Amino acid sequence: MKQIIGRILIGALAVSIPVGGSIFYFASKNDEQKKNEIVDKDTKTDDKDKDKKDDNVKHPSTGVKVSNPHKEKIELFKQSYNNDEVVGVISIPNSSINAVVFQHEDNDYYLEHNVFGGTALEGTVYLDYRSKVNSGRKNIVYGHNGDSDKLYLPFSELEAYYDKAYYDEHQYVLFEDEDGVGTYQIFSVYVETSDLSYMYMNFKSDSSWFEHVQYLKNKSMYETNVDVDETDELLILQTCSHNENFAKYKDKYLLVVAKRVNYE
């Protein structure tokens, strides 16, 4: 049976591998029965796929078809790692966060496999197996975080979002796939210690979806003044929290929640 994130984000180990201008890494494992139970009840995602672009695009002046640079980039990463499970690259402008994203049918897989698919405690960054990159109502990307002077931990900078001033300067997340780049605006930042409903994918109606989106917005630790509605498609970045205010909790996940505002 597939598992959503049975072991994730507690006690980070990491390694960095610089390839093609991006950094790829990460983490350790921890069993969490609660998250397994969520997935047992929720194993399918909404099927609201975006229209896929042609592999070739026309030059705006000549009308001649030219290769799709996004697809070429993803294919290059697949070849570099000899791994067909590369689905995109996630980044936050003017930050250290810039990582290739993988996806496997078993959500536990990349907790203990590296970018080459080899067994490794450092793992790597990955997309929830139920998500479809830059399509559907919700994408969830998992990455580990920890304290280290020697190892590069890309998602560690997410903890800077505890500071509203940092948020003001870093409101957007880019998620590139083989067809283009999705731009997402962050509207909520908070630490979850018990309620795992943010992982739900299936919603019976637009109204139930909007109720969920509004719930995520209301959980934010500060006001972002970003409006949301029932048409929004979300990207959630999840990592462990090392903030001392949440030290007493066993499970503590920092969630950075954003809505898609553009795709091109």
Task: Give residue spans per PLM region.
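Solvent-exposed, non-transmembrane regions of membrane-associated and secreted proteins
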Residues: 26-264
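Hydrophobic alpha-helical membrane-insertion segments, chiefly the h-region
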Residues: 16-25
